[in-house]
């Protein structure tokens, strides 16, 4: 199966919110680079949309075994998939997704794109904000390989960015101790440590 064919199937799945069998389960083994190439073609097929940032998925090594992945993945976020809410309230239409899940996020905005020419890049933060990402799996029951996830755009569905806070010298220290409480139907659902997420 050609990259173009795989990208067409994925873009149709996303557009119709209809799940498909993972390519890895069909014996189609993609390299990491091929999977990112597929994701690029998928973006083109879904129509022109300005890329405004990147999401990094699977940064929590504790869940790698659950999803059978062994490294983080990157996925583009576009102007059409990112929303802003200074009030920290926002309604998302979940009918556009296949099998959505919600994840609390600390959204980070860099002052400029890092240069990777000489070793470790110097990164300068502009602002941070609380946020929620709607992650979505076009593969049933969230069963997929690493390259399946990459090819589908890093499982990114939508991101809601809350009130922005300018970064100060104390921000890094404050982030280490930040706590998040999740409520469902006005009842406390979970309050994980930041080191667990």
Task: List the model feature ranges, each with a label.
Residues 189-196:
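Conserved small/polar residues in nucleotide/adenosyl-binding loops
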């Amino acid at each position: 199966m050609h990259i173009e064919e795989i990208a067409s199937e994925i873009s149709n799945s996303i557009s119709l919110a209809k799940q498909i069998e993972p390519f890895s389960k069909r014996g189609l083994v993609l390299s990491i680079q091929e999977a990112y190439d597929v994701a690029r073609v998928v973006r083109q097929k879904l129509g022109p949309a300005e890329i405004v940032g990147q999401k990094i998925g699977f940064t929590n090594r504790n869940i790698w075994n659950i999803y059978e992945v062994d490294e983080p993945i990157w996925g583009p976020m576009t102007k059409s998939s990112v929303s802003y809410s200074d009030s920290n309230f926002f309604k998302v239409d979940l009918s556009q997704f296949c099998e959505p899940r919600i994840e609390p996020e600390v959204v980070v905005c860099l002052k400029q794109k890092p240069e990777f020419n000489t070793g470790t890049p110097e990164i300068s933060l502009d602002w941070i904000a609380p946020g929620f990402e709607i992650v979505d799996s076009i593969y049933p029951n969230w069963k997929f390989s690493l390259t399946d996830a990459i090819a589908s755009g890093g499982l990114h569905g939508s991101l809601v960015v809350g009130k922005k806070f300018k970064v100060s010298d104390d921000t890094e220290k404050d982030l280490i101790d930040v706590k998040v409480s999740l409520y469902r139907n006005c009842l406390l659902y979970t309050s994980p440590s930041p080191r667990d997420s």
